[in-house]
Amino acid sequence: MTVVRLPDGTDKVFDYPVTVLDVAESIGPGLARVALAGKLNGRLVDLSEPIEIDSDLVLITNKDPEGLEIIRHSCAHLLAHAVKELFPSAQVTIGPVIEDGFYYDFSYERPFTPEDLAAIEKRMQEISRRNLKIERKVWDRSKAIGFFKDLGEHYKAQIIASIPNDEPVSLYSQGDFTDLCRGPHVPYTSRIKVFKLMKIAGAYWRGDSKNEMLQRIYGTAWVSSEEQNNYLRRLEEAEKRDHRKLGKQLDLFHMQEEAPGMVYWHPKGWAIWQQIEQYMRQVLAKNGYVEIRTPQVLDISLWEKSGHWENFRENMFITESESRHYAIKPMNCPGHVQVFNHGLRSYRDLPLRLAEFGSCHRNEASGALHGLMRVRSFTQDDAHIFCTEDQVLEEVTKFIDLLNQVYIDFGFHENLIKLSTRPAQRVGTEEQWDRAEAALAAALNQKELNWELQPGEGAFYGPKIEFTLKDSLGRKWQCGTLQLDFSMPARLGAGYIAEDNTKKIPVMLHRAILGSMERFIGILIEHHAGALPVWLSPDQVVVLNISRNQADYVQSITNELKQNDIRVSSDLRNEKISYKIREHSLQKVPYLIVVGDKEVENQTVTVRGRSNHDHGAMSLEGFVTLIRKEMAERV
């Protein structure tokens, strides 16, 4: 007799062997038709999975997040099946699920073309309509390796050979196509209905540039056509908002081959940077931080002491001078510890909050570089808080308040929070980890925040909190972090004199809000589609004349606005006013002031906002009040 407990607490009792599908059918034929898989005692399994002991079971349908992931995983197999039918000599490698879709990597004698992509998608639709049963079987390892070698699938044979001996080798078959996979998968190919192939890209085998270059086909799959169409519309909008396009259109920055992964900031782009940096300086000062500056090039011996040389060496730029070896800093923390160590510290000095707009360099792979979002030279809004264990809870709580206010001021009102706890390999005692994790969780709970636990995902030196923004298109950007560090202060000799006159090692909190200035500006550009809030816009106002008769008045207005700390320029070109308005509107300037003979006579200004919003005529003083209010409110 087997007892299966359902999520509502109901027990289903069977006196014969059953599968997950049998349980679904016992509940009702409707559920059996829509079920995709099951979660058996917390483990995702196929509908064909036998239930041999008393178990807890959750049936997974396409309404569950896991259901959509299973559909996408099965769609990756559908893609590989179609490629093998159309291009039999192609070799299949891996095909995982990614955010919003999936991909599959292939080795083939020639590059796939857009026409190939269309043919593959059409064949996928045909295979879906065949309603092939998808079956799982566990194979003997050597037999599975031989099977794929006989098919000429040498990559699959390599993967199987690398699977640990204690793991089963499971293969999934649909018709005459068989693939290696842990699963689970949908029961029939017909359950994969809504999908689209998106693009072709290059990818190295096992992600190593020393290996063969493969062809990666990306796709997306959804439960309904409506969801897929909404996703495609979001992609289209994201393409319009691409910060690289807008950066060129708005004359903000450029990048070139002579400095890969490094940014040339133009005056307008640098104006945005300066506004962000000045704002951050103000909020840091108000919250008890002191700003410092540390060297960019440090002797390798310091990186060896900190542990970065051992763990981060391949991403560091190295140089040599006078027989000494140096590294350009990839992060700021060792330098901040040196500032803390300079002089005798007392418990009365703690917490000490050291902040730096630290310029860092990391030797990222050229293929990973992406505009402002992934660069080699970047500036972090970095800070390190040195405190006692008893001060951790209060410091974390204060940081959360600061971070939330900063995000709101920049127009982000929703963020996701994850707490990552102790990994298997770690430093520090269990008691230290218990207290540290409890303090971080308590701070999040004290602020009544929703957060997700990520067991085992913390750094080796301490637990961490990650803050992920959601932008106006619903995309997620991990920016803020707070990491508790047991290791580095001890490794670099940091200490303070405690109240009992003994020397103790401080706790070190690594924290950032924006992450990197470059990436955050890229996110801001895309979030606002280039139409930045007034307080951040490089040009807040442009004053336009209709004819030469108004040139002196335009200059007078421009000077008055500058005196009120408003970023303003004038356009006195001998062009039609409609042309000038259109040109500056495309530059996404928040306000255009149009001046003709009537405005000169009445000593007024006619104001146009974005999206052709006509504010009409008003006094210059009235406009100054309007724009300064918007600047103060950061709208």
Curated annotation (Swiss-Prot):
User: Would the keyword Mitochondrion turn up in this protein's UniProt record?
Assistant: no
Per the UniProt entry, the Enzyme Commission number(s) are: 6.1.1.3
Q: Where is the TGS domain?
A: 1-61
Segments of this protein annotated with the region Catalytic: 242-533
Q: Which SUPFAM superfamilies match?
A: Class II aaRS ABD-related, Class II aaRS and biotin synthetases, TGS-like, ThrRS/AlaRS common domain
Q: Where this protein primarily resides, as one coarse class? A: cytoplasm
Matches recorded under CDD domains? TGS_ThrRS, ThrRS_anticodon, ThrRS_core
Q: Which GO terms describe its molecular function?
A: ATP binding; metal ion binding; threonine-tRNA ligase activity; tRNA binding
The note on the cofactor says: Binds 1 zinc ion per subunit.
Reactions catalysed:
tRNA(Thr) + L-threonine + ATP = L-threonyl-tRNA(Thr) + AMP + diphosphate + H(+)
Cystines in this chain: none
Q: Which Pfam families match?
A: HGTP_anticodon, TGS, tRNA-synt_2b, tRNA_SAD
Which GO terms are recorded in the biological process aspect for this UniProt protein? Answer: threonyl-tRNA aminoacylation
Q: Which UniProt keywords apply?
A: Aminoacyl-tRNA synthetase, ATP-binding, Cytoplasm, Ligase, Metal-binding, Nucleotide-binding, Protein biosynthesis, RNA-binding, tRNA-binding, Zinc
Name the protein family. Belongs to the class-II aminoacyl-tRNA synthetase family.
Q: Provide the function of this protein.
A: Catalyzes the attachment of threonine to tRNA(Thr) in a two-step reaction: L-threonine is first activated by ATP to form Thr-AMP and then transferred to the acceptor end of tRNA(Thr). Also edits incorrectly charged L-seryl-tRNA(Thr).
The entry describes its oligomerization and partners as: Homodimer.
What is the protein name stated in its UniProt record? Threonine--tRNA ligase
